[in-house]
């Protein structure tokens, strides 16, 4: 195989015929029904001809990255093109909040000595979701969440988004949920409570470090086969957050309390 292919991807392809359930992590991103891989790539120049030649699905990210779905039969030929710098397979991610608190210099008792409250900024939480009804994310009966992208929701053209994944709830929709006038499908719950905890520590109305910031929430999607949150959902969330900050011309901070090492 080409040397720009992730070694885990090489191993997965070479051992797939001997697959067993204990190695599910290795095959994250592979669809046995379609014999395709969902992958993260880094590339140079225009690759639209490769998209057509290898019948790929592609979503272009910022800074020369993209997420593709490609048939395994075409992978080596695609990787051999000099415009393809690197190909990485998705990996699972796990909840990790304790080290994030340590790295942020947050102890059990936090005192804000700087007079900074996040006013005028956006705080993005890419995690397990959020309890959007919690009073830490509501002020004067209105949601402080600018948007909530539930990657695990069923995608519908009625509520189309550029990623063709999940459902993005607007601030107006969240407000109508709070006042009881919303008649649509509700966002999925934060069953683990991890994202809600992270958001409250960082930006809760009453207890947060930045109580005046507005929130952008992404609930990370899961791999179809393993049901595990993956790096692809994480990367899409980062892309969405950065694009939102650029579009609104506002500074944005991104919290990632998920990881895999």
Where do the model's predicted regions map?
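Autoinhibitory N-terminal propeptides
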Residues: 1-63, 76-112, 135, 223
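Ligand-binding face of N-terminal immunoglobulin V-set domains in extracellular IgSF glycoproteins
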Residues: 68
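Short, flexible loop/turn elements at secondary-structure junctions
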Residues: 45, 72, 91, 130, ...
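Short acidic, glycine-rich surface-loop motifs adjacent to enzyme active sites
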Residues: 241-261
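Subtilisin-like serine protease catalytic core
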Residues: 111-232, 247-253
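Short, well-ordered amphipathic alpha-helical segments that serve as non-catalytic structural scaffolds
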Residues: 236-240
